Amino acid sequence: MIKINTPFYVPFFERGCEFFEDIRDDLISIIMEIHNKDPFAIQGNFPKGKLLKYNLTESNSNFLQIEHKSIKKIRSWINQNLIDSYKTIKIETQKVNIKSSWFHVTKTSGFHNMHMHPNTPLAAIFYIESGNSDIGNSWINPITGYIDSLSSRWCQSTFTSKFVPGKLIIFPGWLLHSAPPHQGDKLRILLSLNSTPII
């Protein structure tokens, strides 16, 4: 019998948060309190300006360090899932450094164009509020060079996730990815983070 190998492997991890409904309102309240201080302000200096990010609020990069019971609870849960994910890809660690974390609040037509997260073996996105659109994020397949139309049957050039509130997606930070223009009529809310294992 022929054996299938997958030497070029790009891992994605997904998990739904079983206690999400218990903390959902708290998370949204905390995020919106920060958002309302400076609505749709983007932190930092981005040379591409509106070509990179548009119609969204991006918080400072220490959101998960806020000492609130709901944030502490989701931080602990995300941390354990990161540890488990690192172990699955043969990076043994008992502790993970979430070196940066932030939220996005995005209004209709807002987007975050293609980018990657340097020095981040695993990044993560946690979906909170869909804003009445189930379009999540898009990633570009790093394996390029298709020369025939049949290859797309088993190896897509892109992957787009569904925005399901309470879902965590963990992925290699070096993958090019984006948040496509928001098509919902309400605000889209999510968390993002960068991590490194402590070995």
Regions found by a protein language model. Name each.
Residues 100-170, 180, 187, 197:
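Catalytic core of non-heme Fe(II) oxygenases with the double-stranded beta-helix
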Residues 4, 178-180:
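Karyopherin-beta/Importin-beta family HEAT-repeat alpha-solenoid scaffold
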Residues 1-91, 111:
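Non-heme Fe(II)/2-oxoglutarate
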Residues 82-102, 106, 124:
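Hydrophobic, well-structured mid-protein blocks that either form specific transmembrane helices
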Residues 95-96, 183-185:
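A short beta-turn/loop motif at secondary-structure boundaries
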